[in-house]
Amino acid sequence: MASETMGIALGMIETRGLVPAIEAADAMTKAAEVRLIGREFVGGGYVTVLVRGETGAVNAAVRAGADACERVGDGLVAAHIIARPHREVEPALGNGNFLGQKD
């Protein structure tokens, strides 16, 4: 996994609730060529959505996702981009909680 994602940006949006997270994920994937790699139910109703792609695309996607999330209500908690995550960060992303896969 690490070899195919090295040098690819990581975008994250954390929301209060599932509806803003879905809205953000939809907006991110429509706004730029990014791959929706996962979601994490953090607890207490918080959901984090993660995308990967080229830095410019991830930047545009996270901005669009954050804007869409704010339109749903006050669901946006945080939005952040890591341009090139260190290889030591990659195992933390591989939690098996990816969209489209059965648990």
Swiss-Prot record:
Keywords: Bacterial microcompartment, Carbon dioxide fixation, Carboxysome, Photosynthesis. GO terms for biological process: carbon fixation; photosynthesis. It is found in: Carboxysome. The keyword Chaperone does not apply. InterPro entries: Bact_microcomp_CS, BMC_dom, BMC_shell, CcmK-like_sf, CcmK/CsoS1_BMC. Pfam families: BMC. One of the shell proteins of the carboxysome, a polyhedral inclusion where RuBisCO (ribulose bisphosphate carboxylase, ccbL-ccbS) is sequestered. Assembles into hexamers which make sheets that form the facets of the polyhedral carboxysome. The tight homohexamer forms a pore with an opening of about 5 Angstroms in diameter. Belongs to the bacterial microcompartments protein family. CsoS1 subfamily. This is Carboxysome shell protein CsoS1. It comes from Prochlorococcus marinus (strain MIT 9313). The lineage of its organism: Bacteria, Bacillati, Cyanobacteriota, Cyanophyceae, Synechococcales. The gene is csoS1.
